[in-house]
Amino acid sequence: QFETGNRFTDEDAKAAYYKTISDGKISDLIPHARYDKASGLFNLDLKAKVHDQLSGGMGGFISSTSSNQICIGAHYRTVSLNSLDVDLTGQIGQSYTSGILSARFDLKTAIPMYLKMQAVASKQKFYQNETLFYSDRMPSFVTQSEQYVKLRLGLPFLTSSKAVVSVGYGSMTDKYYQSNTVDFSTNEQDRSLYDLFVASMKFDRNNLDSYMYPTAGTDCSVLGLLAYGKERFRPYDTTLQSNSTQTLSWLQLEGNIHTYLPISNKFVLGLRGKAVVSSKGLLSNYTSTIAQAPAFTPTPHSQTIFNPAFRSTQYLAAGVIPIWKIMNNLQFRNEFYLFAPFRQIYEGPNY
């Protein structure tokens, strides 16, 4: 942090500058160096512009499929050494609805760190077939609901990375049909209910120039998590399958790399890779197992569809992203991916 009268090098000033603006509380920080003839040093004057304490926003998008979405959010922040940030976000859509409440405390410690508490409730529907224009008469093939609370501790790692340790507890409910030939009008969905405790550690470095469609920078992360809990299976027709309960525990490791290499002023080549290794076993049936398996969803559209071919507890995925930058705010990009499951989940008799 900056303090009046401190002596520091230009590298110290650069590092402290980026630390000061990285938390988002200061929108602009203009340094001005004045030479002091008496001491032979420079005095550094800082002019800071602080974000408003209370802010809000609204957004959304319109799609010809079931992915229409509206997002509303509010943010409150204080500016102090032990500052507080509170976020409230809600999303409403035909296939996805969620609410998120989070509070972050920046701690006054020798090593800068933060403590973040988060409560989330969400519901996502996956449909058997996407039509050109959405019809609300089409039932969802898989519906996933979850509610959880999580506590995170974040701190710097090396020079330009961060480490986040988190613990959380939550419940999930999956509703699904175990066959795509079932008569939706006469049958109800089977249910799998989960109560889970999860502890994780993540190392992350991200300097991409855009969240949605970047053309420069690198996002690299390594995640390790340990999960423990229970699954309760509740079939619609108990004459074909009986209720069951089993204890779950598994270890999962993930590695992700997403980087962009400049080829020329107009052309950029993006590279993407992801590896997942998990000891998670089979659940009550094929549909519940594949619904809870880690999914590879590199594009916005892939996050809205349920594709069993891109789900596995262990897989390696890689892709290339050639980009033509037509102008500053206009680009033409293609994305090509390969998905290779190490441990493929095969469909068999459900009962």
Region locations from a protein language model:
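Acidic/histidine-rich, surface-exposed loop or edge segments in extracytoplasmic proteins
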Residues: F2-E3
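Gram-negative/organellar outer-membrane beta-barrel architecture
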Residues: N6-M212, C220, A291-P300, I305-A318, ...
